[in-house]
């Protein structure tokens, strides 16, 4: 039965047309960061268990050109231990840049055992920084086994002009490495590429126009931000503090979805839903059920 489910999804993903987005998109930030180690396979599966419709994640590139999940461009000592369970100093952690390490080295770190005081509700377990391909395989298999509906992948390219060839490759290479995995795993119809870096979104729009894009913004007006980007993305993803009734109407009038980040209070979720947003990104998926 599992083979049947997977083969059906593989067949359908060959059609490059994007799948319809959920009526209201419930997104788990870095999986389910408030409840599980961030950007890990267990975190993504937890989000699925909680009936989220989209898995949000961050990407970095290793020295051997592997696509991995991590928000930071180097080891984060706040929640990372060596494979032997030893602490890592901040000074040492900053030297351990992923773009200068091969994946075999990256995989040796434990990002799930150490208590993370910012997220005290996190379940603790020994887990490694995964490849994007590992995450996709695990998610697709889990969906097949559990019978849960197909989820979307909201994938952020963590890049900036200042970091080119220092912390990550240039945008055209970054996007190609990511899309090689996405297309190879045949999840293109359920993929959204998001970024604060307009350059990666511009490359995506030029070379992969069939793939949905999401423009992350933290400040500025809609008009100015879209002018900087140079095209109209599928999704406009502002910081929650920027969202007003007027912005929601303006974004939707241009044919975009509006999905704010990162909303970790039930009262704020209720406010945004009342304004008519198309989805919400949160660290705490359990808030949707309260």
Task: Report the location of each language-model feature.
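Phosphate-group recognition and catalysis centered on beta-loop-alpha active-site segments
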Residues: 6-290
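Bacterial N-terminal signal peptides
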Residues: 1-5
């Amino acid at each position: 039965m599992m083979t049947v489910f997977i083969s059906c999804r593989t067949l359908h993903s060959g059609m490059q047309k994007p799948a319809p987005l959920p009526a209201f998109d419930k997104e788990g930030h870095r999986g389910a960061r408030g409840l599980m180690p961030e950007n890990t396979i267990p975190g993504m599966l937890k989000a699925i268990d909680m009936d989220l419709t989209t898995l949000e994640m961050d990407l970095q590139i290793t020295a051997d050109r592997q696509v991995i999940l991590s928000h930071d461009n180097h080891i984060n000592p706040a929640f990372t231990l060596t494979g032997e369970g030893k602490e890592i100093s901040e000074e040492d952690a900053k030297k351990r840049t992923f773009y200068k390490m091969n994946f075999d080295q990256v995989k040796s770190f434990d990002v799930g055992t150490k208590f993370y005081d910012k997220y005290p509700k996190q379940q603790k377990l020994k887990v490694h920084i995964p490849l994007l391909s590992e995450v996709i395989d695990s998610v697709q298999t889990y969906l097949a086994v559990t019978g849960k509906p197909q989820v979307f992948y909201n994938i952020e390219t963590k890049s900036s002009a200042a970091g080119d060839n220092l912390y990550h490759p240039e945008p055209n290479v970054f996007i190609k490495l990511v899309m090689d995995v996405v297309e190879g795993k045949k999840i293109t119809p359920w993929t959204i590429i998001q970024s604060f870096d307009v350059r990666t979104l511009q490359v995506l729009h030029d070379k992969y126009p069939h793939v949905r894009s999401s423009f992350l913004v933290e400040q500025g007006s809609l008009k100015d931000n879209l002018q900087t980007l140079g095209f109209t993305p599928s999704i406009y993803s502002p910081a929650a503090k920027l969202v007003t009734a007027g912005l929601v109407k303006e974004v939707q009038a241009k044919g975009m979805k509006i999905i704010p980040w990162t909303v970790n209070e039930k009262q704020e979720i209720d406010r945004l839903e009342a304004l008519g947003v198309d989805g919400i990104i949160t660290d705490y998926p359990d808030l949707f059920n309260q």
